[in-house]
């Protein structure tokens, strides 16, 4: 949401105020939305590598139980890509940098999401 809002020219205040009345408003948005908007990935609440590890274990447990979690597996892969891009020791919200990197490399916003 933040990536799209910034691309559309919305201010942080307008985006966060608008998000409050939608399903996008969550603990994470309330506590980290402003950090993502400002691209302030330090200080951290938890490292991206730790979030990736937790997602990896979660997907493995689901697979062992015969449960399909394709969205969770996709997130795990995004966190792995962010770690491999060098963001592993930053705040877990730095996964957002994949979108910024793709845009700076001339990719469309959809490409890093596939």
Predicted regions and their residues:
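Small-residue-rich helix-loop
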Residues: 10-23
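Amphipathic alpha-helical interaction segments
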Residues: 14-17, 73-77, 94-97
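Short secondary-structure capping/turn micro-motifs that flank functional sites
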Residues: 21-22, 35, 78-79, 98-99
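NAD(P)-dependent dehydrogenase/reductase Rossmann-like domain
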Residues: 80, 84-114
């Amino acid at each position: 949401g933040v990536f799209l809002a910034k691309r559309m020219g919305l201010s942080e205040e307008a985006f966060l105020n608008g998000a409050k009345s939608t399903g996008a408003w969550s603990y994470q948005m309330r506590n980290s939305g402003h950090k993502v908007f400002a691209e302030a990935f330090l200080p951290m609440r938890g490292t991206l590598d730790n979030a990736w590890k937790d997602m990896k274990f979660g997907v493995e447990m689901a697979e062992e139980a015969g449960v399909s979690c394709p969205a969770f597996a996709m997130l795990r892969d995004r966190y792995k890509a962010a770690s491999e891009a060098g963001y592993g020791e930053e705040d877990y919200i730095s996964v957002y940098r994949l979108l910024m990197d793709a845009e700076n490399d001339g990719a469309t916003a959809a490409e890093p999401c596939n």
